[in-house]
Every structure is written in structure tokens, then in C-alpha cells.
Swiss-Prot record:
Signal peptide: none
Entry protein name: Biphenyl dioxygenase subunit alpha
Alphabetical list of PROSITE patterns matching this protein: RIESKE, RING_HYDROXYL_ALPHA
Keywords recorded for this protein, A-Z: 2Fe-2S, Aromatic hydrocarbons catabolism, Dioxygenase, Iron, Iron-sulfur, Metal-binding, NAD, Oxidoreductase
Assigned protein family: Belongs to the bacterial ring-hydroxylating dioxygenase alpha subunit family.
Binding site for Fe cation: 233, 239
Gene Ontology molecular function: any one: biphenyl 2,3-dioxygenase activity
Residue stretches spanning the membrane: none
This protein's pathway: Xenobiotic degradation; biphenyl degradation; 2-hydroxy-2,4-pentadienoate and benzoate from biphenyl: step 1/4
EC number: 1.14.12.18
Coiled-coil intervals, chain numbering: none
Gene3D superfamilies found in the cross-reference section: Naphthalene 1,2-dioxygenase Alpha Subunit, Chain A, domain 1, Rieske [2Fe-2S] iron-sulphur domain
Length: 457
């Protein structure tokens, strides 16, 4: 059988000489709304992130419809570790490290496909779709003395490392840590806000249009935080050209006034966050146009969605953004969803795809696909705006003084409580930074607390 996490125990906890637990905790001051800029640029912190954050979090790898048939597979990443996600004979899904246990070569080098087995191109070790080592060239000659008896080599001991796998309403998540809480516990009270996009119909969702991939030279936390907490940029300067381009011909910017009425959500545990406007469809209209806006907010499909997600007044919610910590981000109503794969402290690789209601009319699915190409893909007008800001921030962070500054995360900190009882969980004003403070506080805890005994919900 394939190796489990317990077969490859990590070394005892060691800390960088620069980053003790107390030093890490001092980087994020949620009570006073201050962030140390080194969290975005320090190489030692990044190496610890790979172990403490990406080695212990539930990471979104794709959608069940990416691998519908037995033997269908998708190669992706958990942090910087390459993995293979495979549909099994019993229709379950396995995820295992894309690393041959002989000399560490990548087992599968294609993006995806269908297979009955995987063979390493270096020495020909072969694994079945469950990750079991099933064939070793010259096994008897290489590992035995050609006498009867124990060869001292058991193929069952040499399968690739297996991750835990759980799904949430079509999304596939994996986790390396056997001690981490189950997925639903990890998602905490964020699930109703995810359901706004994932549970609108009994047919569920499906991924369309393939997976688009591109690299942005910025730290992964800038992207994750923006989708977690930052409606502020959309309401100020960042997206004016994109908004204008998306308006119907008979409208101009003078007819669009972004709302000041809205909320954001900070999860009780886990660093997840979301934000949205209330009773104002102008942002959705300007991004995806009238056809999708009408489908998402009016008519039978919208009414069914409201019945299926009774915890939230979803017909009043517009322009929602959300991040499931650390790197799963999406925009309900626009329906882009992506994982931010870290590539060092100064680079992130974006893997994005489009989700639609599985029973939506074909013309609606196609409209979602086309609007996402226009707005939120590698060349999309809004994606370009966001990326330009993140890239320039990271360039600034090269400087010694720039990395030594304290950044302001005080929005909403001293404002009277804006908690909205219509929305479950802890909520704040839409132009606050409550969700961002929650995200960075959880990041700080994961980085400084090596045991789930203190970290768990």
C-alpha cells in the first residue's frame, strides 16, 4: 500500500534563528491594526510557511468534474509539492505526492489525462492509480541474491506519500497533516458564504473552460487577502477602466455609483473571510453584464438558490468576494475560482477556472465563460489591474527600508460595531479590514504554534 503521512515523520520542531515563536507573533498586531512588511518578503518566513501553513492546511486542488472517470487524473500542487489527483475505481479520489520513491523523479509530467498506471521515466518504477508501487524493473536481480526467501525489499513500503482528501460540494481539498481537523471543522462558520456559489441547485456545480495558469511576481498573501477582505480597492481607483468597459453601451460611469452599503465576514476560526454589497447590483452589472446579473439575482434559478441557502439573504448580496485560508479564492456571481500556488516569497502561480450551476442553460454557461475571459483571467481587464498593483508592491519590498516598515490595517478597528444580524458570524462594514486582520492573525498562529493541541478550533 502507499505511504501515509506517518511513514515520513518530520524532524523535531526547529525554528529559524531569526524567527522564534515570539518574533513571529510580533509581526501581526491585530489589536492595533499593524502588519510588519517582512511577512511578504522574508525568505526564512517563506520556508516556514511551506511547513507550517501549506503542510497543515486544507488546500483546494480542483473540482470533482475535472476528473469524472476512473483513471482520470490532474497534476497540481500543495504549496510547492507536486501532487497527482486521481479518480479511483470506487469513485473516490486520491491525492499523492508526484515523486518516485526511487530517486525522487516526478512520476507524471503531463497536466492531466486518463491512465491505468503511472511509470517514472527515469528507472521505470510503475505505480497504479491508487499510488501503489506495482512494478520494479529487474526487481529480483537488483534486490535479491537470487536465492529463495526475503529480498529485504517490499514494494508495499515504497508508494508515494498520500495526502488526506475530502470534498466540499464539488471542490476537492487535500491536507498532509494527519492531526489536522476534518475539512468541515476547518471551514468553520464560513460554509454558508461558500454555498452562495456552490449550493444554488441540487445539480451542484461543474467546472468549465479548462484551467488557466499564469505567474505573478508577488507574494501569495496579497492575492489571498484581497479576495478575503478588500472591497475597498474596487470602490476607489483600481478598476475604473474595467468597470467602464463592461457597462452596456447606453450607460456611462456617471450612472454607476458603487454602494457604501455592505458587510464583510470574518470566520470564528481559520482565517477565512468574505465581503459583499447589499441591495446594489451595479458592481455585478459592470463586471459581467446584464445577462448573468439577471440570471444570478432574478428568476427561478435565483429563487431556488435562496431557498437552498436559507442562512443568508443571498438575493440581497452582490459582488461577493471570498478566500478560504490560505489560498482558495473566488467571486460568486462572477464565478471565477482559483488557487494561489506559492513560488517563493516573491512569486505566485495562479490556477483559475470557472464554476457554473450544472443545470444552468448552455447559453448562461457560455456567457460565464466569455465574461471570465474578458475580466478575470491572465489577460482580463480586472485581473490586470490587480496584478499590476501586487507586482509594484513586491518591487518596492526589495528595499531594506521598505521591508522595515509597519503597514496599516486599521480600517474599521475603531468604528462602532457594524455587525449585521442578517448575516451569520462576525461581520463588519464592507470597507473595513476585519477579515484581513482575521486572516493574518490565523497566519501568525499557524506559523508560531506547531501543535494542533493549541491551534485547533
Amino acid at each position: 500500500m502507499s505511504s501515509t503521512m506517518k511513514d515520513t515523520q518530520e524532524a523535531p520542531v526547529r525554528w529559524s534563528r531569526n524567527w522564534t515563536p515570539d518574533a513571529i507573533r510580533a509581526l501581526v498586531d491585530q489589536d492595533n491594526g499593524k502588519l510588519d512588511a517582512r511577512i511578504y518578503a522574508d525568505q526564512d518566513l517563506y520556508q516556514l510557511e511551506l511547513e507550517r501553513v501549506f503542510g497543515r492546511s486544507w488546500l483546494m486542488l480542483g473540482h470533482e468534474t475535472h476528473i469524472p472517470k476512473i483513471g482520470d487524473y490532474l497534476t497540481t500542487y500543495m504549496g510547492e509539492d507536486p501532487v497527482i489527483m486521481v479518480r479511483q475505481k470506487d469513485q473516490s479520489i486520491k491525492v499523492f505526492l508526484n515523486q518516485c520513491r526511487h530517486r525522487g523523479m516526478r512520476i507524471v509530467r503531463s497536466d492531466g489525462g486518463n491512465a491505468k498506471a503511472f511509470t517514472c521515466t527515469y528507472h521505470g518504477w510503475a505505480y497504479d492509480i491508487a499510488g501503489n508501487l506495482v512494478n520494479v524493473p529487474f526487481e529480483k536481480e537488483a534486490f535479491c541474491d537470487k536465492k529463495e526467501g526475503d529480498c529485504g525489499f517490499d514494494k508495499a513500503d515504497w508508494g508515494p506519500l498520500q495526502a488526506r482528501v475530502e470534498t466540499y460540494k464539488g471542490l476537492v481539498f487535500a491536507n498532509w497533516d494527519p492531526e489536522a481537523p476534518d475539512l468541515k471543522t476547518y471551514l468553520s462558520d464560513a460554509m454558508p458564504y461558500m454555498d452562495v456559489m456552490l449550493d444554488r441547485t441540487e445539480a451542484g456545480t461543474e467546472a468549465i473552460g479548462g484551467i488557466q495558469k499564469w505567474v505573478i511576481p508577488c507574494n501569495w498573501k496579497f492575492a489571498a487577502e484581497q479576495f478575503c477582505s478588500d472591497m475597498y480597492h474596487a470602490g476607489t481607483m483600481s478598476h475604473l477602466s474595467g468597470v467602464l468597459a463592461g457597462l452596456p453601451p447606453e450607460m456611462d460611469l456617471t450612472q454607476i455609483q458603487l454602494s457604501k452599503n455592505g458587510n464583510q465576514f470574518r470566520s470564528a476560526w481559520g482565517g477565512h473571510g468574505a465581503g459583499w454589497f447589499i441591495n446594489d447590483s451595479s458592481i455585478l452589472l459592470s463586471v459581467v453584464g446584464p445577462k448573468i446579473t439577471q440570471y444570478w439575482t432574478q428568476g427561478p434559478a435565483a429563487e431556488k438558490a435562496a431557498r437552498r441557502v436559507p442562512q443568508l439573504p443571498i438575493l440581497d448580496m452582490f459582488g461577493q468576494h471570498m478566500t478560504v485560508f490560505p489560498t482558495c479564492s473566488f467571486l460568486p456571481g462572477i464565478n471565477t475560482i482559483r488557487t494561489w500556488h506559492p513560488r517563493g516569497p516573491n512569486e505566485v502561480e495562479v490556477w483559475a477556472f470557472v464554476l457554473v450551476d450544472a443545470d444552468a442553460p448552455e447559453d448562461i454557461k457560455e456567457e460565464f465563460r466569455l465574461q471570465n475571459i474578458r475580466t478575470f483571467n491572465a489577460g482580463g481587464v480586472f485581473e490586470q489591474d490587480d496584478g499590476e498593483n501586487w507586482v509594484e508592491i513586491q518591487r518596492v519590498m526589495r528595499g531594506h527600508k521598505a521591508k522595515s516598515t509597519s503597514l496599516c490595517a486599521k480600517m474599521g478597528l475603531n468604528v462602532p460595531n457594524k455587525n449585521n444580524p442578517a448575516y451569520p458570524g462576525k461581520t463588519a462594514y464592507v470597507y473595513a479590514e476585519e477579515a484581513a486582520r482575521g486572516m493574518y492573525h490565523h497566519w501568525s498562529r499557524m506559523m508560531s504554534e506547531p501543535s494542533w493541541d493549541t491551534l485547533k478550533p
